[in-house]
């Protein structure tokens, strides 16, 4: 099992939190101190928590479970899409649609519409339509793909969520909590860790930090899939550990 080390996190700037005036007291126990009015995250706390989260994801993947990657803010979206695609995991990189988990039946109908439009675009149906109708369907396809393209192959609810910036993705976390889906989240000094089962205290803005989180998580999924046990599968409810402190 490959693990992240302290040097990786320092190089990526994981330890840089937000300005001290924006801090959330619930993150106090993960803060080492402050420098130039910026909170410094205690990486001695982050390191084992990050590696625990990676181990959890690897166990889930080994049991053929699905981990959904969620990161819709500008600094995260591209990296989330790239790394999720690399490990064959579902992802949301543009905008979280309300009900994506709690109203999955409706979402599934939209995914079917997306697939139908993709088929029409490929089999020449669009070419047989009027220019106006073809344009309308092309726009519909583009819009649906941007919103749902990352989850069109999910085939059901995910077994866990990995979230970059828990404040920004609070709706996703609330939906997962309602359904009992475990949440792994990068939590910065200005955020609330509530509703997060596996907390990773760290910088949720720096691109290098986001790359480290996402690459490590994708690697964990790939390792798990490559080590699928012959007989024993680990299911989400069995692998889920108690909520982090």
Curated annotation (Swiss-Prot):
Checking InterPro entries in the record gives: Ribosomal_uS2, Ribosomal_uS2_bac/mit/plastid, Ribosomal_uS2_CS, Ribosomal_uS2_flav_dom_sf
* Cellular component GO terms, alphabetical: cytosolic small ribosomal subunit
Which keywords does this Swiss-Prot/TrEMBL entry list? Ribonucleoprotein, Ribosomal protein
> What Gene Ontology molecular function terms does this protein carry?
structural constituent of ribosome
One of this protein's GO BP terms?
translation
Q: Which Pfam families match?
A: Ribosomal_S2 (PF00318)
The entry assigns this protein to a family as follows: Belongs to the universal ribosomal protein uS2 family.
Q: How is this protein named in the record? A: Small ribosomal subunit protein uS2
Native organism: Pseudomonas putida (strain W619)
Task: Report which gene this protein is encoded by.
Answer: rpsB
